[in-house]
Amino acid sequence: MYPVDLHMHTVASTHAYSTLHDYIAEAKRKGIKLFAITDHGPDMADAPHYWHFVNMRIWPRLVDGVGILRGIESNIKNIEGEIDCSGPMLTSLDLIIAGFHEPVFPPQDRDTHTQAMIAAMASGKVHMISHPGNPKFPVDIPAIAEAAARYQVALEINNSSFVSSRMGSEDNCRAIAAAVRDAGGWVALGSDSHTAFTLGEFTECRKILDAVDFPEERILNVSPRRLLNFLESRGMPAIPEFADL
């Protein structure tokens, strides 16, 4: 089990079913030391208003020894790589994830998806790309892995993609993991929980990584300090409350 989970949704995304308190309780039960709440960006139909993201600043950083990161799963909106996270949202959040979602960016062709994803990474706003192995959004996998390594953006292996969403992602995700390994980039694991019961669930992710002998030293979830060092290298101010995580 890894002590860090980087992708989950609360009732603020109304197709999810758990609260911040639910996730804290489950993290304590499972030994998760650090997690990120990453509700959908405002361009999704059932997403929270942008005030929700700006107001995350009122959250405590640490509850009963569990660290809480303030995040978003933003939407890649167009071929220029624009995302629905800007202005005060960017400065209020610790973790900016970006990905394709059909209601915002209808599937097109491999070249268009690749160009949009690389543009989002090149913008400097994004720390992590969500579910890049989605078969509905094929991409040039070596090209995105090389770009991710160049721009220091993690590519996600998403456990939900093998269980309840984006079925048929396995082959793409194995290829992505191998390409990231070869490019010297970072992988991030996300449960993509829409209920707290699956917090920290990475069983299927682990199978993908094992299949390509992915190196542990390039997985951000191995420890809170590794993830925090990565975010700080990307410009996030050090968070004093997390010093002992």
Curated annotation (Swiss-Prot):
Zn(2+) 2 binds at residues 15, 40, 194. Its cofactor is Zn(2+). Its EC number is 3.1.3.-. One of its GO terms (molecular function) is phosphatase activity. Binds 3 Zn(2+) ions per subunit. InterPro entries: Phosphatase_YcdX_put (IPR023710), PHP_dom (IPR004013), PHP_phosphatase (IPR050243), Pol/His_phosphatase_N (IPR003141), Pol/histidinol_Pase-like (IPR016195). CDD domains: PHP_HisPPase_Ycdx_like. Zn(2+) 1 binds at residues 7, 9, 73, 192. Zn(2+) 3 binds at residues 73, 101, 131. Keywords: Hydrolase, Metal-binding, Zinc. Coiled coil: none annotated. One of its GO terms (cellular component) is cytosol. One of its GO terms (biological process) is bacterial-type flagellum-dependent swarming motility. Homotrimer. Belongs to the PHP family. PANTHER family: PHOSPHATASE YCDX-RELATED. This is Probable phosphatase KPN78578_10290. It comes from Klebsiella pneumoniae subsp. pneumoniae (strain ATCC 700721 / MGH 78578). The lineage of its organism: Bacteria, Pseudomonadati, Pseudomonadota, Gammaproteobacteria, Enterobacterales.
